[in-house]
């Protein structure tokens, strides 16, 4: 790492009635952050919630269209249903995601005290709540049939996205960006193709590209002169009367979609990428995604990079991620306690069924 102060974008996130978190605050330090926890501890939820607060999107889609009862924590849902069955008319539970940001030129316009902690801070807030004005009558009819109430009626909710100054957020005005990298959702070939094309574009002058095109064309022409191709075309020509009156032959596709750069395939130690081991493929997916996105993001979020990796490979990968993102804040989730032995405890956040500890 450089001697410069480590970058920080996100200071903490507050989650209320969101997925498995009834009321939780997760804090982050500058530079590299590692969230360690077992499966179902909520690591993925925290990363998705950070991205949600910055974009108002859940897995790429607007949250207002993705909201379902399953986003409301089970404890809040159970209390709500018990109150309904007891004959009450409680308002449905409110869902809150608050992202507290470090103050900078990019975030100062998001400053205010419109947050659950009452802090004068920079940040963004997603709130999903019952829309009484629009659905008051419908909700009244809904709770009257208490025997039919089995879930929180999120169809009667509205989703608001505000900054801590209580202003509605214009997505184009958000100057802080994140990149969420989950190897399980990335196609290895598309990442490799993008990386290759970028290297080709940046490295080859027009003359060199023309020479490669000519060399590839020569290979195509020599293939057409092969005796096996000639034999195939002779057989086709002999049977052409069955399908056409014209001479029927096969030749290499010479269209723009079959040029030399599209015929290249990346290899590792002479082995095609898709033949590499699962751990190596996951590592490549993450590093290729970083190469593509790191320049455009202030915050890098990486989901469980350790799949199919040995402990030593995981440590090497984390070091490479950190090295590639020296000027970015990074949050990595993992269920591997091995990293505790390799990193300072100040880099770790432990997630469990209890409140998270840093």
Residue ranges and their predicted role:
Residues 1-55, 260-358:
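Switch/communication elements of ASCE P-loop NTPase nucleotide-binding domains
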Residues 8, 21, 90-96, 119-123, ...:
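A general secondary-structure signal for short beta-strands and their flanking turns/coil
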Residues 49-118:
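Conserved P-loop NTP-binding catalytic core
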Residues 87-92, 116-119, 152, 290-295, ...:
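Conserved catalytic network of the ASCE P-loop NTPase/AAA+ motor domain
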Residues 94-96, 102-230, 234:
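Electropositive, glycine-dotted interaction segments
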Residues 16, 29, 100-104, 129-131, ...:
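Solvent-exposed residues in well-ordered beta-strands and their adjoining turns
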């Amino acid at each position: 790492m450089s001697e410069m102060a480590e970058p920080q974008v996100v200071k903490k996130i507050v989650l209320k009635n969101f997925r498995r978190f009834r009321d939780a605050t997760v804090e982050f330090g500058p530079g590299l952050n590692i969230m360690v926890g077992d499966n179902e501890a909520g690591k993925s939820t925290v990363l998705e919630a950070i991205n949600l607060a910055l974009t108002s999107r859940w897995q790429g889609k607007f949250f207002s269209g993705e909201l379902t009862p399953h986003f409301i924590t089970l404890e809040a849902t159970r209390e709500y249903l018990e109150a309904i069955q007891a004959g009450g008319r409680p308002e449905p539970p409110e869902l809150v995601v608050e992202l507290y940001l470090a103050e900078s030129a990019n975030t100062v316009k998001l400053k205010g005290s419109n947050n659950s902690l009452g802090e004068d801070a920079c940040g963004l807030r997603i709130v999903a709540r019952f829309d009484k004005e629009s659905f008051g009558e419908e909700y009244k009819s809904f709770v009257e049939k208490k025997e039919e109430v089995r879930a929180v009626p999120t169809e009667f909710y509205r989703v608001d996205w505000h900054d801590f100054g209580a202003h509605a957020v214009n997505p184009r005005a958000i100057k802080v960006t994140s990149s969420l990298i989950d190897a399980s959702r990335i196609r290895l070939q598309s990442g490799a193709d993008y990386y290759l094309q970028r290297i080709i574009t940046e490295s080859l002058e027009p003359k060199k590209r023309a020479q490669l095109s000519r060399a590839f064309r020569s290979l195509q022409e020599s293939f057409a002169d092969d005796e096996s191709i000639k034999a195939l075309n002779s057989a086709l020509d002999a049977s052409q009367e069955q399908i056409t009156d014209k001479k029927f032959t096969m030749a290499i596709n010479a269209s723009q979609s079959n040029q030399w750069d599209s015929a290249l395939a990346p290899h590792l130690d002479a082995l095609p990428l898709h033949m590499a081991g699962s751990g190596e493929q996951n590592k490549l997916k993450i590093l290729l995604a970083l190469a593509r996105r790191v320049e455009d993001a202030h915050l890098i979020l990486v989901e469980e990079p350790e799949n199919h990796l040995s402990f030593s490979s995981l440590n090497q990968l984390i070091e490479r991620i950190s090295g590639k993102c020296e000027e970015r804040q990074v949050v990595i989730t993992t269920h591997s306690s091995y990293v505790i032995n390799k990193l300072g405890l100040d880099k770790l956040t432990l997630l469990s069924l209890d409140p998270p500890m840093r």
